[in-house]
């Protein structure tokens, strides 16, 4: 991943935190979605995940890029609503690095 991607996620996270803190549902999609509750945020995340899968299976790369962007955006909202950060996700991925996927999954079971 490029440094630019980390900077992009950092900017996105900051904007989402600002919009959540402002709580202006009439002026902000992020705030309006959050006002509907965690369940609605999770539902929207699921919808975006399905759309990303459909784009991938149909081999439509531009659509997949768009849907993956929507997926990351909505995941960012859900993480922020829960008080979690991309740094926490990065730390977990770093912790798992070098561990076999089968081994890591078995450790969680």
UniProtKB/Swiss-Prot annotation:
InterPro entries referenced in this protein's UniProt entry, alphabetically: HisE, PRib-ATP_PPHydrolase-like
Domain of life of the native organism: Bacteria
GO terms of biological process kind: L-histidine biosynthetic process
Predominant location: cytoplasm
Pathway where it operates: Amino-acid biosynthesis; L-histidine biosynthesis; L-histidine from 5-phospho-alpha-D-ribose 1-diphosphate: step 2/9
Keyword S-adenosyl-L-methionine assigned: no
GO CC annotation terms, alphabetical: cytoplasm
EC number: 3.6.1.31
Single GO MF descriptor: ATP binding
Pfam families: PRA-PH
Subcellular location field: Cytoplasm
Catalysed reactions, as listed in the record: 1-(5-phospho-beta-D-ribosyl)-ATP + H2O = 1-(5-phospho-beta-D-ribosyl)-5'-AMP + diphosphate + H(+)
Keyword entries, A-Z: Amino-acid biosynthesis, ATP-binding, Cytoplasm, Histidine biosynthesis, Hydrolase, Nucleotide-binding
Keyword Cell cycle: no
Family membership: Belongs to the PRA-PH family.
Protein name: Phosphoribosyl-ATP pyrophosphatase
Species per Swiss-Prot/TrEMBL record: Sphingopyxis alaskensis (strain DSM 13593 / LMG 18877 / RB2256)
